[in-house]
A protein has these predicted regions:
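Phosphate-binding and adjacent anionic-ligand microenvironments
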Residues: 1, 19-213, 220-224, 231-238, ...
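Cysteine protease catalytic core and zymogen-processing segment of caspase-like enzymes
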Residues: 1-20
Length: 254
């Protein structure tokens, strides 16, 4: 199997925390960072290990910002995004491929010492912190007409947000342009973000998450879908849970 960017980010965060715990170096001031469209499994890993997790916008300048504002107060221990970018240390303020390659090799060696493969480690993480399947849909709309279409799509989503996704009830709507969070009970909160961004997120009662944003570099709008399956318990569950999650994703795409 090919391990995707969400899975590598998940393994990086898991290993960094486990290694620090083993060495007695995990501190209350340590923190991780992930982009808002990256898997929520990382949030579970951080939560269960009492490590602060910060969500930021897509792009490593936002991860670098979190490092900068915490210098001398808290320690950054890792951060990344769903598209394979990761920064395991705080010296470089951008995605660091060489360091990430070294880290994944270290993780593979660590797993091998335990008689495991990276796949075995992935399954172990899912069993402990919950299974999720992520899928990105890119809708390409070239030219000025396409740009207008994408703009209208976002306008329509704001005017008529979905009430259900693939049969699951939407219970929370986040709008990073208005910096508002709306809940199904009618309550409204403010989003604590450093700037506005043209991103929408919808969360369902079964922890399905869908994020929508126009690409900043290409003529397309991107839909990031994440589906959970709490029935995942062991390696034998992987194919079944993946197939069920893909069925759910297909239902959401419709």
């Amino acid at each position: 199997m090919i391990i995707n960017g969400n899975q590598t980010a998940m393994m990086f965060c898991y290993y960094i925390i486990e290694n620090k715990k083993k060495l007695g170096k995990l501190k209350p001031t340590d923190f991780l960072v992930k982009t808002i469209v990256t898997t929520e499994v990382i949030a579970e890993i951080a939560k269960k290990n009492n490590v602060e997790l910060r969500d930021c916008y897509t792009g490593f300048k936002w991860i670098a910002r979190e490092i900068a504002i915490s210098e001398g107060k808290q320690q950054y221990i890792g951060g990344g995004e769903e598209s394979f970018g990761f920064l395991p240390y705080d010296k470089v303020r951008d995605k660091d491929a060489p360091a990430s390659i070294c880290l994944i090799c270290e993780i593979a060696a660590w797993a091998k010492d335990q008689g495991k493969t990276l796949y075995d480690l992935l399954v172990q993480i899912y069993a402990e912190y919950g299974f999720s399947k992520e899928f990105t849909v890119n809708v390409v709309r070239p030219g000025k007409t396409g740009a207008d279409e994408i703009k209208q799509m976002m306008t329509d989503f704001r005017a008529n947000p979905p009430q259900e996704l693939g049969g699951s009830k939407v219970v929370t709507w986040k709008d990073y342009q208005s910096l508002e969070v709306k809940h199904a009970d009618g309550s409204v909160e403010k989003l604590d973000m450093p700037a506005t961004s043209n991103v929408l997120q919808w969360f369902c009662d079964d922890n399905t998450k869908v994020s929508v944003r126009p690409s900043g570099t290409e003529p397309k709008i991107k839909f990031y879908i994440e589906v959970k399956d709490p029935s995942f318990k062991c390696a034998g569950c992987y194919n079944r849970c993946t197939a069920a999650a893909m069925d759910k994703i297909e239902a959401i795409k419709k």
